[in-house]
């Protein structure tokens, strides 16, 4: 409201988003937030306003997390990287997020290096499915393929370590089996390793900015149902669903 009153007020004293000539907008999630504007000078002024507002309440901005950047250079927020490329906004998993998931998968494979294949797959599926679910609405297809490949490399080392005296063909046939046209399916008779590439990318419909989740619950419930239906239809059309890859 503070920013709305300062940057979206008309000459008569009324404030409305249409009066926002400098395009100052706030997007917040928990204690993380971003503020956008049409130029750096306005953002510097906004920063002072925010600092004064927080100081009165005994708070202050984190110096290491606070930065002013151009949208063409990009910035990270909530695990995603936002950047404009040739006039088009691209939202992708951030580099930090990719490093974090890679490290977590590596630690999991290492921790279960002596465990049965079934248990390892269960633990990995919990990680990969959750991460793919979170990033399903952004440009993440190439990232999914990259993480899948890195995980394959980890699992190959895991398998070779367990059988150092066996040849590559024996190791491959022991842990990877053909299924639905895929020759390298890391699976057993009871469970299949989930591949992120099988997660359909489904964009989230833009919000009506005049809607409030506490006052317009029907709108948000309907919006959520529509998105879930789109995801369901997208998966039904996917190769994994049509070939019943995950059906045992």
Model-derived features: positions:
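Non-catalytic terminal/accessory segments
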Residues: 1-248
